[in-house]
């Protein structure tokens, strides 16, 4: 870097000779810009360009929301433009970007300021470099391209910014428009300077433009956190959080210095150096580079040969960001401050604090500021600065920030550096010197003259020469001067006069000489250095006063063009002085004609720009509407902005909740509500939830809501209701309708109005029902249990959707407390938040589950009939609601519910009625292993197998296990820790007699044990301390400490104890923990029955082998001389029973023969429309008393109808199927006289698919002789329907015409026969050619048969009837086909609707046909049967009268199938290709799937049940369960009694249920205390029939650190307490259940005492069983929702990981207890004495993503150790196909083909091929027409068909796919991937 400036004469330096600018606020010109800076003012304001309230979010957290409503804006109308001046037509001006227009005006002003005329510029080598960044006008026009003006391409093209200037001024140099973002104009300056230096141009104009016309860039910059919230730029201040945007248009004119001097131009400043560079690869593209900025500054100074030390001021980029400002200050410090004197600080400022960041114009804003600073010698303050940045130590640097305006320091050269950075890394720098010092250093002159300058007048010879700049000495004279003014028209001239007068009047002069100088300069400037326009005027004056006066008086002479073109404007007859004539630089610019504005904005764009509301969290932002009173909102839901949505997961997918759609509709309604009235509530009705909106983690979901007045008619508009629809799109391809419905806004009315009174009464009824519901709900449920239950079926609710805090319930009802969900502070407030509303909806689930009945499937809302939401719903953090709900199952897969919520003031907040929820899955738990039926594997059993035959036993289980081997003993001494009993002495003697090789057995008597502990170190010890006696359980402190020393010192322990007494198992439990706490310890236990202890010699052999064996096993038992080891096995049988109990007595399906069943059967509904899973169950109704008016029919046949299909598929809510049957009367009621046993009859009814059917006699009819049972079973429904429609309702008369739709079906064929009988002209529709032929065979004329697949039949009917139509329509079609049929009616016609689709969907009906006096009637025979059975009986009689006289016959064709093929029969109807009727025969001997129902136990209301430890979480749950099972007397024992709030509440609720509760404080480990408690209980309560022992004390600590007291505290309640219960409760019990723990099975670390106690309890259960007493020990695993471990934070270590995947739910424990109690109440018991639960497998751990449990290292658990990979390998091995003959290949199943695949790609291709074939078959199209890139729903796979597809996928691929996956917006490829991932057939390499 040079230390001094180069000063050679003749230079290529570039001068700035003219400028113009327009900035925000008062800075409407360059002079006013300088005034703003000096006065410390700001152009900051709220945005006038768009409605800031529509785009800014005060919370600033939503994407595409503006962080600010403020900026720095031009005061002028940006649409105003002087188009005539530039010769631009209005049409073209309309299309021009205001940046182009303003650039033209500013360019002219800059040329004018430089003294350059249009004439001089024309054809000149002038280059034009214009920098820009944003194009808001272009974006505005592009918002609505259809409305764009003709010249849009030239008007908005960015290149035109430069080209337009070059074109107008006829500039012939380079013309470049450039965009380097915020550095654009300074880069343009650099390029312009280069063009001058290279000689390709002689003049250059540099421009920059930045207008902020739209909101888009505000929002996009906000996305990247660029903008400050208050719209201010706080340059270098610690409070800076971003920059404030600013508008500005500026231009400067450049010339080479030599040329400027030669042309007598103003040299405002000299550009000494420029440079540009790029940041390169930084951490992010918008982050600055310190190194690049340092290089940038150095390059500029090096290029100019400049010294850093001469620079006093640095005009920094200084946007006010915490990332950019510190880096820039550091770069300045590391360049200009190097080797700088410490007393010469660099002053750093930024113009952005005044006018904001003008982006593309920012560089020129800094340049113009710097020019004025150089000229004026003043440094303006940097405003908005108070505290230095903490990231840069300003105080220790040589930098300072000016906080007040001050003069330039010193008198030397004035030099300024200017920085400008682009946000993409394009940087620019310029160095300016003041003109005087520069010219002085070069010995050059300057032609600059400020009109305020008082520079001395050079004396000359008295000649005043016209504008050549020569210096001649003359004498002073009073000669008058001529001033030339011009304009494009008279108005322009007048405006120029006015601005000039205003300017001149601001001048003051110190003497006449300075006034004369000013006048000479003014005359020179106006005459020679300004463009001359066609309207001109000459003013002659000799003084300023005279000049002003003449202008104001318009005293001037018109000037013709000839005169104007001469250089005679300044008279020179008398030359009195010579003055150097200079161009004045501060004269007012040309006065533009801004009377016209040009703004080509469409309505659509304007509505967007001026929208009233911003994007909000639910509905997004308002959109332009396309209809009167239509409103549209659109937004993008991003999980990063709305994280609460992630907490709503259905079947593993994030699904937008139904409550969200309701909340959206309410928010939209709030937007358009009458602001002059108070809203009371929002009412919704007929809300249909359609396709689910699935949200992906990183893909925003587009949501659109439309709202308009509800058009209930096509010729009018009803305004009381608004119809809304919500759509979504997540793949930028397909929009899907998610929800639609109706909403009305209810406003507050006067309290005495009829509406208010009625509403008050209605609310009172709801509140009363709410109160009564709360009173009857006594069963409590923990919210955690509810949410885990919901998660088990696939409704995975996270924190935001877990706001239910209290639950009480009974069958069908619930009462809950719901907290108001409050999102974080950035979210916009809602009338009601979706999470809050969703949790209100969730209260229906406890009502549905009732008294501990689990929820079987994931159910989601599909229809809401009515809802009301109060407008002032509480949403504060502490607010909550109390609600009541009722719910019931309605059909196979639907629930019907309602609920009401009140706030804390007991005011109604939300009510809902007719909430329909539909099942979309079965109960599953994806995080736990399940069998094929979806049941959870929670139970295990402990099995003892021979130690020598382990392998062969376990081969039966198809698993391997650790071998059990024996080896010769080690050559070492073995110590015998000898007990006192004779058994111990005998064993000791026997051991010592054995040949031990080099070692020997050394006995240590018990009495010497304490003194010999040091001899145990590292030894093998055989402990006989508990042979025949108890050492451990009752050990005193010394004995306990001795035990601890034994365990600590010995390396190998073989402990022998009794298996006959339970106390001998204490050491077994402790040893399990010891092995887990000390991995190096070998601690083996041997349990020996008392009878085997006599054979000491054989026992010694066994013990000797165990002492030396390297076996991995540690627990042994000697039984009958056989040594055994234990293994833990899955207990599938118990699992199945528990699952059945948990399913409220669900079925187990077994094949049975119809004749062998021995009881009546009925067809049961399968799950979720699984036609292949239809089964039969016992018909309990057949066992009840036959009513007096009933008959009993032994069914021989039953008819199948399409309604059966709809019920099974879940599309019609019903619990039973089958509506017609035939058979033989088997019994008659006492009042029945018309039938006898043995009569052949048929019946119409409900649930007729059963072997024995009961019906009232009125609905039964004898069948004629000769009519088969199959025929008779097909008569009732179809004929009663046809008869009712045609004869009863339509009142058909002979000669009338009838249109029968779907005429080839059962009803259609029956209707044809009745119509023929009545003599009607028949028109009919069918769907295929075979059906057409069938009708023709039935006598329908060929030209009267039409197609039912489209609406062509309507044209055919009207054509055939010559426009009259038909008299009767029997309709079963829907939608447009119904509408067309309705319009086919003749005058006075009758339309009879027997379909239900349009009724279910609440479709609208055209009213205009009623003008023809038409009648529309709808009915369903089933409803007549239920509601008017007498009428139904009469119809049935009339039908059989027709059949009897052979007027009609049973419907043909008739397809008969055995009842065992009912699934196939239903599927046939589902396909829609059958003709006639289908009947099922009930012949005995058929094989049917029969369910054996498990019945939950019923507890006696005359017995007492004892619950020990009944006030813990699990104890209270069991108490409630017992009450639900019928118990009415409970004795609850606990150490402290019912002291806790929860215990008291539990007792109160039990007593409210009618349960007598005796709560006694009792220590069960104290036999006396327990006996007293039982005596008290016997006095006040019935006999005790059952005991639950759940007492426990936890004292967790490692055994090494455990005290004697801690040992006994844990043992006493379980060991002593359970023994005492055993002693006192020996006989007369229905059950004795011990709640032990799985921790006693594997030996939980730090719980040796607890494990020992648990092992004792297990042994005691076996002991009681051996004595013929009731007993079961349940080793319960971790609880997920209740008990001491209900809160996950209470668990430590691996238990935290195990709880969720392996833990038990409350419903599991209840199911287990139900099973145990039911089994124990039988004699003998059918279950083992010990049941293990809660043990997870390695595979389950792998699926859960956790480490395998450490207990799996124990050989006892080897059968649970199989991983997923091992399981797949085993499966692959077992399923390896044998060689297949070629002729059998075609018979391979899909499973075979998939298993044979060799790669994932092959499997995927195969599955896709099969799926496409299925879709093509469904559509009856060619396979080639199916595009796998499209979602399934695009091929008509709606919710009904989706069920079929799901069932097909399950059957074909063994893959359980959710309905959401089938109806999702994803392409078929994605569905195929899911099938491949879930198929049980697959085991393919990756």
Curated annotation (Swiss-Prot):
Region described as Dehydratase (DH) domain: 618-924
GO molecular function per UniProt: 3-oxoacyl-[acyl-carrier-protein] synthase activity; fatty acid synthase activity; oxidoreductase activity; phosphopantetheine binding; zinc ion binding
What does the record give as EC number?
A: 2.3.1.-
This protein's source sits in the domain of life called Eukaryota
| Entries under InterPro entries matching the protein | ACP-like_sf, ADH-like_C, ADH-like_N, ADH_Zn_CS, GroES-like_sf, Ketoacyl_synth_AS, Ketoacyl_synth_C, Ketoacyl_synth_N
Instruction: List, from the UniProt record, the residues annotated as the active site of this protein.
Output: 182 (for beta-ketoacyl synthase activity), 317 (for beta-ketoacyl synthase activity), 357 (for beta-ketoacyl synthase activity), 648 (proton acceptor), 838 (proton donor)
Matching Gene3D superfamilies, A to Z? 3.30.70.3290, 3.40.47.10, ACP-like, Medium-chain alcohol dehydrogenases, catalytic domain, NAD(P)-binding Rossmann-like Domain, Polyketide synthase dehydratase
| Coiled-coil zones | none
Q: Name one GO biological process term.
A: secondary metabolite biosynthetic process
Q: Where is this region: C-terminal hotdog fold?
A: 778-926
Keyword set, alphabetical order: Multifunctional enzyme, Oxidoreductase, Phosphopantetheine, Phosphoprotein, Transferase, Virulence
Domain commentary: Multidomain protein; including a ketosynthase (KS) that catalyzes repeated decarboxylative condensation to elongate the polyketide backbone; a malonyl-CoA:ACP transacylase (MAT) that selects and transfers the extender unit malonyl-CoA; a dehydratase (DH) domain that reduces hydroxyl groups to enoyl groups; an enoylreductase (ER) domain that reduces enoyl groups to alkyl groups; a ketoreductase (KR) domain that catalyzes beta-ketoreduction steps; and an acyl-carrier protein (ACP) that serves as the tether of the growing and completed polyketide via its phosphopantetheinyl arm.
Q: What is this protein called?
A: Highly reducing polyketide synthase
